[in-house]
Amino acid sequence: ATIYDIIIPTSVGITMPDNKLAHVNSTPQDKAIKKIFAKLEKSVQTISLYDALMQHRQEYVYYRTDHHWTSKGAYYGYVGICEKLGISPHALSEYEKKKFGSFIGTYYGDTNGDKNFRKDELAAYYPVSDKISMKYQNESGKIVNGHVIADSSKYGISNKYLAFLEGDNAYTVITNKNIKDSSSCVVVKESFGNALVPYLTDHFSKIYVIDYRYWNGKLSHLVKDKKIQKIFFINNISMTRNSYLVGKLNQQIR
């Protein structure tokens, strides 16, 4: 299998105004990503999404009140991945877009923000293919049916991001019956990957999604058993400073 390492910058590196960023004691994220990539084995294909997002920094690519990227930001990340893979991305206009209402996320919660603060809006773009199904392992270990994009309009205002893959489930399998070949991949991710995977579903007959924070399997076994062709490691750059997460990931790839 071919291994791809995909690093997503955070909003600090993309949308923070330059005059504010100058006062932040932090290495520029594009340089940090290059430094990380330089330490990887030569066989690993690297994909930095820094430039893809920086080109659209004036657009609504990150939430204001949350640490995640928006569905539109994830779309630009998907375009960057397609360029690396040599496949044609769908145009944004090809997707059906739905809005699920106001959203306030982790930044708001962490700062006990003013109730009058301008809220985010959570929107999602549905896959172009019309024969996509999803199953995932819930917290009790049971395999249940789910949706790649779930209607989160009735969820609590802080839970709207659960629209993507129905949240952070340990193990998810997505099937696209419109694709007749045997193309498959595994996505090893944290929550930033949730908004990105729906775009990838149009290009693979099977996608296995692993949230390494909760999964306890061995990646090598899964790749061999399912005859997986591509492995995508998808992380936001701040994950690298979390020794617990690095340790969890290390356990699964050994």
For each feature predicted by the language model, list its residue ranges.
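Extracellular glycan-modifying ectodomains
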Residues: 1-254
